[in-house]
Amino acid sequence: MAAISPWLSSPQSFSNPRVTITDSRRCSSISAAISVLDSSNEEQHRISSRDHVGMKRRDVMLQIASSVFFLPLAISPAFAETNASEAFRVYTDETNKFEISIPQDWQVGQAEPNGFKSITAFYPQETSTSNVSIAITGLGPDFTRMESFGKVEAFAETLVSGLDRSWQKPVGVTAKLIDSRASKGFYYIEYTLQNPGEARKHLYSAIGMATNGWYNRLYTVTGQFTDEESAEQSSKIQKTVKSFRFI
């Protein structure tokens, strides 16, 4: 009994092993819980960041899509440099730092931005639905190059599917992707749009990114013509869109 009594006579010796074990387990559980919470918070932050970027990406895509429906109405004349080259002349915008070759007899105008930084239109003198427009959109710091929107194939699919309303009842505009490719920092996308009962429109876009020294800007150059105008305008419009470059 004498051998046992020292262990029993000490409440500290009696209780500490159990308390130590319990506290150890409790601490381990708390540490694990904190670790899970930290991981959860980090994951929520990552998801929130992705959602934020995703929302801004969708906003930009909506602006790109809306630029497609621009029509050269109620515009004011704009100055164009006339460095003639055969049937084309070079239009230079020193403010927005770009130049583009347009058909010699086409008119130039500025439209109300309406959410854009700038919209410039080029179109024939005669009555026509053919035109080329350049819409400039401001971008946040998350977008530093075209790949920020994903690969060109996915970008094109998202853009065109966002325009398609053929699934609606009654049926809306039908949008079909024809081709997409990336070249020298630009995304080139070719597709068609057709409203019920109207002529099909062919659209050819060049989309690129540049900075003015303060923030990034997205330039969407879109040329369009109908099936009826295809033979006359197709080559002109594609040449015009492809000639766009930053200065």
Curated annotation (Swiss-Prot):
UniProt GO molecular function: calcium ion binding
Entry keywords, A to Z: Chloroplast, Plastid, Thylakoid, Transit peptide
Domain of life according to the entry: Eukaryota
UniProt GO BP: photosynthesis
Transit peptide per record: 1-26, 27-80
Transmembrane segments: none
Location of the protein in the cell: Plastid, Chloroplast thylakoid lumen
Keyword Transmembrane helix part of the UniProt annotation: no
Gene Ontology annotations for the cellular component aspect, listed alphabetically: chloroplast; chloroplast thylakoid lumen; chloroplast thylakoid membrane; extrinsic component of membrane; mitochondrion; photosystem II oxygen evolving complex; thylakoid; thylakoid lumen
Pfam families in alphabetical order: PsbP
Stated induction or repression of this protein's expression: Down-regulated by photosynthetic redox signals.
Entry annotated with the keyword Chloroplast: yes
Similarity field: Belongs to the PsbP family.
PANTHER family per UniProt: PSBP DOMAIN-CONTAINING PROTEIN 3, CHLOROPLASTIC (PTHR31407:SF17), PTHR31407
The protein's name in its UniProt record: PsbP domain-containing protein 3, chloroplastic
Species of provenance: Arabidopsis thaliana
